[in-house]
């Protein structure tokens, strides 16, 4: 009886919402990312590298102003942050073992990443074009009834990568509202393989929260955590986050 009731509820919810994947694609295709936007983008990073049983930690944060309009992408750094990066470089000349998280953060503010954060509908459509829908179920999330879509992502791999891999998994979960607008996503990847008799493992989880601003789907919160292990070199784990604010 309980099982039948659960199936009935699921069928009613599915009937009410319609085809989630079709709604998602239709909504994304209507977002043409043309309206000018200015955003504050804050990046935070932390990492732990273990080599010869010795752990090295590094962390940092930086904030920039990003303009995205018909002229392209413009990224504005503050003079204080430029000075911080220069100071870090000077200290690195005196001690090459010092971590340099600020330079890495500055490099993360590239046009490709900023475009993905402020005009994400195109990125998501490309991912969907190489993905297979596995399931669609209703789910309550933060007090809102959403549709949960699970995908297997089949991104193309080079012949060399295929030969070196033992296993590879890439799964994407999307939560969309009644109109097909993405609310959040989570992508998990796991890879195991070997090359030249050296084994390696890597895994990552990327979480995104979305917000519609005009004709844009922006990523208001992006959080990535990853870990890598190479049999003869040690391990590395890192987390990074972008927080996007639009006035």
Predicted regions and their residues:
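Absolute protein N-terminus
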Residues: 1, 18-19
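Structured extracytoplasmic
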Residues: 19-169, 191-195, 238-247
């Amino acid at each position: 009886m309980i099982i039948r009731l659960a199936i009935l509820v699921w069928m009613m919810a599915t009937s009410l919402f319609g085809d989630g994947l079709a709604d998602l694609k239709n909504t994304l295709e209507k977002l043409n990312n043309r309206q000018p936007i200015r955003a504050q983008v804050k990046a935070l990073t932390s990492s732990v590298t273990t080599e010869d049983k010795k752990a090295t930690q590094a962390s940092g944060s930086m904030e920039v102003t990003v303009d995205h309009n018909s002229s392209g992408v413009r990224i504005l750094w503050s003079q204080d942050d430029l000075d911080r990066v220069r100071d870090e470089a000077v200290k690195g000349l005196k001690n090459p073992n010092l971590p340099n998280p600020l330079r890495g953060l500055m490099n993360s503010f590239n046009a490709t990443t900023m475009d993905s954060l402020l005009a994400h509908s195109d990125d998501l459509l490309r991912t969907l074009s190489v993905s297979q829908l596995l399931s669609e179920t209703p789910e309550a999330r933060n007090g809102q009834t959403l549709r949960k879509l699970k995908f297997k992502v089949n991104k193309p791999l080079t012949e060399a990568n295929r030969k070196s891999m033992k296993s590879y998994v890439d799964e994407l979960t999307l939560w969309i509202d009644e109109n097909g607008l993405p609310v959040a996503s989570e992508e998990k990847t796991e890879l195991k393989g070997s090359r030249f008799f050296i084994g390696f493992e890597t895994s990552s989880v990327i979480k995104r929260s979305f917000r519609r601003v005009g004709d844009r789907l922006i990523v208001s919160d992006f959080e990535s955590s990853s870990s890598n292990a190479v049999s003869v070199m040690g391990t590395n784990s890192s987390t990074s986050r972008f927080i996007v604010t639009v006035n």
